Amino acid sequence: MDLHSILQPISTPSASVVTAPLPATIALPSPNYYYPPVAQGHYPVNNMWSLPSNVRVISSHGAPGHQTSASQPSTVMPALETNASNAQYYPAYSVINGNNSVQVASPAYTVSHSPHSFSNPRYVAVPQKSTSPNQVCSYCEPLPNHLTKTKSCSIPPILNSSDRSPLSLPTPYPVQYSTQPVSLPQPIAAPAPPSAESSKSTISDEDVAWQLIRLGALSSNSVKSSPSKSFVSISSPVQSTVKPTKASGVVKSEKVEKRSLPPQDFGNASSSTSAKRRRPDHNHTSTLDASSSNTSLASTGPMTVSSSTVERKGKEASEVNPNSTSSVTFSDFAAAISRSRCSRCKKSKKGCDRQRPCGRCRDAGLNSEDCISDDDMPVSNARKPRGRGRGRPKTKN
């Protein structure tokens, strides 16, 4: 079956227009453009399509073919093996010649043994109107089959008749061929914060201990900002209360010591020590000064400042450490001041209190009473060692 037998029943006596051989320009397709689906003037062909002999076809697959003997410049035709019995007819397309048009039915031949056969349908796009007398026929790449589930493609149609480069649309639009609904990923909900009840049930003993430590630190800070009286009552381990008693017309003060345990503080131990350091000393000092002055007036009359200071220091030491073996009294301190100091304690700034022997007597097993180091004067004529930092060798050559 040839083309003339197809065109003969369609041509009627009323349609006296004879279709002349029209050159057709087929542009090369581009894989990056989208060809729209079947619309007006488009029809699908299964594997290959047939056109008149004056229409040139350029295959985009570079298949070996044979040359045509047409009057136009030769182009490559794909090698086809057609069978007339397998021809399938499709709706006609319009061949435009000036202002007149002739309906032409085009069969679709099935490629049986060609190595360049295609399974997807092709689309032939013929414009409805043409400003030039020449016919324009666009040959497109195979589109994805509608029966298969293909995602999308973005290839615009080729509409340029003079240039072989495809015309790119400014906004290529994608087309979804998928028939199943697309399920978007749902956002993962953030875990809810633990409630108060659950957090109470999961608190461990270590958390309770840390909380008590924090509370202890807060209480120590509040103690620092409290008045001095409550301050001393909390931090100082020794509380002294003065009870005046009348004896021989002179008011004497007797100190009643009360031992009190320090409060249990889970915070750092430096809080109580820092509280002691920042405690105003005038209250405690004035009490001690008043008691010492009263005692001195009752017993021996006025004393020097140094002796009162020594007495005060001794009493403070006895109050702090009452279990000490040596009981310090005023007479001992007075004797210590008049007694000559040992050679070891002469060099010290605090002076010798004779409370402990020097290192030589201690090694010999002597106590502070039997210490004889005060008579052991250093020899002034002894040879002093020379330093070795000035280039002096230890041995002579």
From Swiss-Prot:
Domain of life, source organism: Eukaryota
SUPFAM superfamilies per record: Zn2/Cys6 DNA-binding domain
Where is this chain compositionally biased, Low complexity type? 221-240
Family matches, as PROSITE patterns? ZN2_CY6_FUNGAL_2
Record's compositionally biased regions (Basic and acidic residues): 350-363
Where does this protein have compositionally biased stretches of type Basic residues? 383-397
Q: What UniProt keywords apply to this chain's record, in alphabetical order?
A: DNA-binding, Metal-binding, Nucleus, Transcription, Transcription regulation, Zinc
Q: Which GO terms describe its molecular function?
A: DNA-binding transcription factor activity, RNA polymerase II-specific; RNA polymerase II cis-regulatory region sequence-specific DNA binding; zinc ion binding
Q: Which residues cross the membrane?
A: none
CDD domains referenced in this protein's UniProt entry, alphabetically: GAL4
- Which BP terms from GO are recorded? regulation of transcription by RNA polymerase II
The cellular location(s) given in this protein's UniProt record come to: Nucleus
One GO cellular component this record assigns the protein to is: nucleus
Residues annotated to bind DNA = 342-371
Outline the segment boundaries, as ranges, of region: Disordered. 159-203, 221-397
Compositional bias segments (type: Polar residues):
285-309, 320-330
Q: Does the keyword Nucleus apply?
A: yes
What protein is this chain from?
Uncharacterized transcriptional regulatory protein C56F2.05c
Q: What species does this protein belong to?
A: Schizosaccharomyces pombe (strain 972 / ATCC 24843)
Q: What is the lineage of its organism?
A: Eukaryota, Fungi, Dikarya, Ascomycota, Taphrinomycotina
